[in-house]
């Protein structure tokens, strides 16, 4: 399942890796497209025991709206008994996650393969 969807300044691509649904996000995530980001994530977590990896490696900017979507997704996935893992090594993401403390809830992995085997 590969499909690209362009929304605002972001592109979303859904695929799979091992037993995980993968959402690759490219571009900027902010208030203008946070709802689309949320919709893409919700589509991947609809089933029982969802296992989702969000690959943020190609994200060039994220604000608090994007963080809110990720935290909301984490809560929903945990309620469903599932797993949410993130990929991203960009300095802007690492800094954003560290400053806000989100890295304690959602650590960033260097690759999809690393996230899947953690």
Predicted regions and their residues:
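Positively charged, low-complexity terminal tracts
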Residues: 1-3, 118
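Short, charged helix-to-loop "capping" segments that act as catalytic/coupling loops
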Residues: 3-4, 46
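STAS-typified acidic loop motif
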Residues: 4-39, 58
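Amphipathic alpha-helical interaction surfaces in cytosolic regulatory modules
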Residues: 28-106
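Short acidic-hydrophobic, aromatic-tinged amphipathic segments that line or gate anion-handling sites
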Residues: 107-111
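Short alpha-helical segment
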Residues: 114-115
């Amino acid at each position: 399942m590969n499909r690209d969807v362009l929304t605002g300044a972001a592109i979303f691509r859904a695929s799979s890796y091992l037993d995980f649904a993968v959402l690759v996000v490219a571009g900027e995530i902010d208030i203008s497209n946070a709802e689309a980001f949320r919709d893409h994530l919700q589509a991947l977590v609809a089933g029982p025991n969802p296992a989702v990896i969000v690959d943020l490696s190609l994200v060039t900017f994220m604000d608090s709206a994007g963080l809110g979507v990720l935290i909301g997704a984490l809560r929903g996935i945990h309620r469903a008994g599932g797993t949410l893992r993130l990929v991203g090594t960009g300095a802007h993401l690492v800094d954003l996650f560290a400053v806000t403390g989100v890295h304690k809830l959602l650590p960033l992995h260097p690759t999809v393969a690393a996230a899947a085997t953690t």
